[in-house]
Amino acid sequence: MSYAYLFKYIIIGDTGVGKSCLLLQFTDKRFQPVHDLTIGVEFGARMITIDNKPIKLQIWDTAGQESFRSITRSYYRGAAGALLVYDITRRETFNHLASWLEDARQHANANMTIMLIGNKCDLAHRRAVSTEEGEQFAKEHGLIFMEASAKTAQNVEEAFIKTAATIYKKIQDGVFDVSNESYGIKVGYGGIPGPSGGRDGSTSQGGGCCG
C-alpha cells in the first residue's frame, strides 16, 4: 500500500517497562504477557491516517539494557518521533527518564517529537509514580504525555497517533526539510515534496512487521 509519508519512530526506556508490548499492541492489537527481552533492536510497522493522508509508521523497539545503549544511540539518528516509556509501578524507571532524554537530545535531530508514556496504568493499585509527576516532567522538558496500558490497550493507539499528528503538523508548518531523510520522514505519493521537488514514489509491499 502506498503512503503519503513514512515516519520513523524509536521506543526507548528501561528494560521491562513494556516497550515491546506497546509495539505489539499497536501493530497486532494483542498483548503478550511473557515477552523475551529485546536483544538489540526489534521492528514493527503499521499504516495510519492523518488528515485523510495514509501515513506509514516504521517503529524501532530498542533494548533497555545498558550494554545495548550504544546500539540504541545509533537509531536516534533518522527518527522523527520517540516514545519514552516508564513503568508507573517502578519508581526507578521514572527516575532514569532524564538519562534517556539526555541521550535522545544528544543523538537525535532537534525537532524530534517525544511522547512520554507512563505504561501499566491498569496496575493503578501498585502505582509508584503519580500522574501529576509524569505531567510535570513532560511539561518541564517539552514532551507530550499520556499514561497507557499495553495490556488493556488504553491510550496505546492514541499515543502513536498523537505523536504522528504532531510530526505531520511540523511538516505543514515547514519545520522539517522532508527531502532530508535524516529527519526520519520519507515522502511517498501525495506528500509535500522537499525543496528540491524530489519525491520518493516507492510503495510498501507485503504484510507483517516487515511490510
From Swiss-Prot:
Membrane-topology descriptor: Lipid-anchor
SUPFAM superfamilies (alphabetical): P-loop containing nucleoside triphosphate hydrolases
KW Methyltransferase (keyword) present: no
Protein localization: Cell membrane
Disulfide bonds: none
One GO BP annotation of this record: endoplasmic reticulum to Golgi vesicle-mediated transport
Lipid-linked residues (S-geranylgeranyl cysteine): C209, C210
Entry's family note: Belongs to the small GTPase superfamily. Rab family.
Protein name: Ras-related protein RABB1c
Organism classification: Eukaryota, Viridiplantae, Streptophyta, Embryophyta, Tracheophyta
Gene, per the UniProt record: RABB1C
